[in-house]
């Protein structure tokens, strides 16, 4: 059974990013799900699993600006990024897809994890 998971790390403090809003949709469709990360920077259940996970292109929207704004940063350090959009393709509905996001107020890195 395939699944889609994610994990967000805050590079400014080297800790998981809790309470980050994530939107997920299939390309060309409206938002399928909106979830928030837990204290470990993960979502409590897979974003997609089983029959929900179908081949195709998807978009995840990580609401980075809201997250960093909640950290009471100095005005000069207000985040440059508001929403990090990641567009990706799921080819095998039986595979486990994990998309980690390494995040700072001014940049990010995303990759297919394991």
UniProtKB/Swiss-Prot annotation:
Disulfide bonds: none annotated. Gene3D superfamilies: Transthyretin/hydroxyisourate hydrolase domain. Its EC number is 3.5.2.17. Keywords: Hydrolase, Purine metabolism. HIU hydrolysis also occurs spontaneously, but more slowly. One of its GO terms (biological process) is purine nucleobase metabolic process. It is an enzyme of class 3 (hydrolase). Changing residue 7 to N: Loss of activity. Catalyzes the hydrolysis of 5-hydroxyisourate (HIU) to 2-oxo-4-hydroxy-4-carboxy-5-ureidoimidazoline (OHCU). The keyword Hydrolase applies. PANTHER family: 5-HYDROXYISOURATE HYDROLASE, URICASE AND TRANSTHYRETIN-RELATED. Changing residue 42 to E: Loss of activity. GO terms for molecular function: hydroxyisourate hydrolase activity; identical protein binding. It comes from Bacillus subtilis (strain 168). Changing residue 114 to A: No effect on activity. InterPro entries: Hydroxyisourate_hydrolase (IPR014306), Thyroxine_BS (IPR023418), Transthyretin/HIU_hydrolase (IPR000895), Transthyretin/HIU_hydrolase_d (IPR023416), Transthyretin/HIU_hydrolase_sf (IPR036817), Transthyretin_CS (IPR023419). Substrate binds at residues 7, 42, 111. It catalyses: 5-hydroxyisourate + H2O = 5-hydroxy-2-oxo-4-ureido-2,5-dihydro-1H-imidazole-5-carboxylate + H(+). Induction: Expression is very low in excess nitrogen (glutamate plus ammonia) and is induced by TnrA during limiting-nitrogen conditions (glutamate). Expression is further induced when allantoin or uric acid are added during limiting-nitrogen conditions. Belongs to the transthyretin family. 5-hydroxyisourate hydrolase subfamily. Coiled coil: none annotated. Pathway: Purine metabolism; urate degradation; (S)-allantoin from urate: step 2/3. Homotetramer. This is 5-hydroxyisourate hydrolase.
């Amino acid at each position: 059974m395939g699944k889609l998971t994610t994990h967000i790390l805050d590079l400014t403090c080297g800790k998981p990013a809790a309470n980050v809003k994530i939107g997920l949709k299939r390309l060309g469709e409206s938002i399928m799900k909106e979830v928030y990360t837990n204290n470990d920077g993960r979502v409590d259940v897979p974003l997609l699993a089983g029959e929900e996970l179908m081949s195709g292109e998807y978009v995840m929207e990580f609401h980075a600006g809201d997250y960093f704004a909640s950290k009471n940063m100095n005005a000069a350090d207000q985040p440059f990024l508001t929403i990090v959009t990641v567009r990706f393709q799921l080819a095998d509905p039986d595979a486990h897809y994990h998309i980690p996001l390494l995040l700072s107020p001014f940049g990010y890195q995303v990759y297919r994890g394991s």
